[in-house]
Amino acid sequence: MFGDYSISDLGAILAMQGFAGLILFSVYVLMALGLAIIFGQMGVINMAHGEFMILGAYVTWMTSNAVQHVAPWLFPGYFFIAMILAFTASGALGMLVEWALIRHLYKRPLDTLLATWGLSLILQQAYRSVFGAREVGVELPEWMMGSWQATDSIQIPINGMFVMALTILITIAVAYVLFWSSWGKQVRAVVQNRVMAGAVGINTEKVDRYTFGLGCGIAGIAGSAFTMIGSTGPTAGQLYIVDTFLVVVFGGAASLFGTIASAFSISQTQSTLEFFLSGSMAKVITLLTIVAILMVRPQGLFALKVRK
């Protein structure tokens, strides 16, 4: 497998695949952050998480088209407007879903899984009816096109660098909200002991609703970022939902650091193996490795201790 390449060729290949893995890592982190908040903090298995991501992608696509026709002078910075709208739309829909559906199914994981899976099918059909079955893509601003020539053999796309920078900023913001804000302290109090948190005056229902909305809103941002590197279709979210659950479970539920470490290891392993093997074989080997590790450490790499 490696005999056909010189050392310099292998170095360039590993560097390029490593950067491709970083782009995949960025998508995984943005998706997994929202899912880790919902699954790790609330214990809800949200099978419709990918559809909240696609809602953010469609909002970005609509914003791109609207800005080009109504206010073309805003086009170079339309993505920042679209990202805010994507977060708002996905977060608002998430809060509505929590109020109408999820709050009735707490402590019933199988019912929650079935209900959110049905919701994912409903949302897919809704997207197909409104936007059509064909995939759509956004037009990138001129400053986001092209690539940076790192070396003679290594080119790094600018849009990929932008997605990685966005991921870093969102991760820092989420860490601040969860660990240093007063609302984040309430969330962690509810996770540690829901009954005691309610006894000291924390509105646990409100915390649940805003937590679910935040997780879905971050998925919307992930969808917005996804449009920078790929096209969007009604079922595109299903391509990432399994990998995202793997990231969360492998890293350890409710562990922000575990989510990041897990996303990095999975994306880098998968991206590197894809060059030397087929994409399907890379996924199989990655999955088998994760299963083997989880058999030894079923709580994940960095699981948090939770008081019962």
Where are these regions (language model features)?
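Membrane-interfacial amphipathic/re-entrant helices at transmembrane-helix boundaries
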Residues: 1-31, 59, 71-82, 108-113, ...
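Short, non-helical or kinked segments that cap or interrupt transmembrane helices
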Residues: 37-58, 107-112, 183-186, 209-210, ...
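Single transmembrane alpha-helix segments in multi-pass membrane proteins
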Residues: 15-63, 96, 100-111, 128, ...
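Transmembrane helix-bundle core of multi-pass membrane transporters
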Residues: 104-105, 112-180, 207-210, 272, ...
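Inter-helical junctions in multi-pass inner-membrane proteins, predominant
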Residues: 13-20, 174-182, 208-254, 270-283
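Alpha-helical transmembrane segments within multi-pass membrane transporters and channels
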Residues: 70-119, 126, 173, 261-266, ...
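Helix-loop-helix "hairpin" substructures at the membrane interface of multi-pass membrane proteins
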Residues: 153-232, 256-261
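Pore- or pathway-lining transmembrane helices of multi-pass membrane proteins that form conduits
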Residues: 51-58, 103-128, 237-249, 265, ...
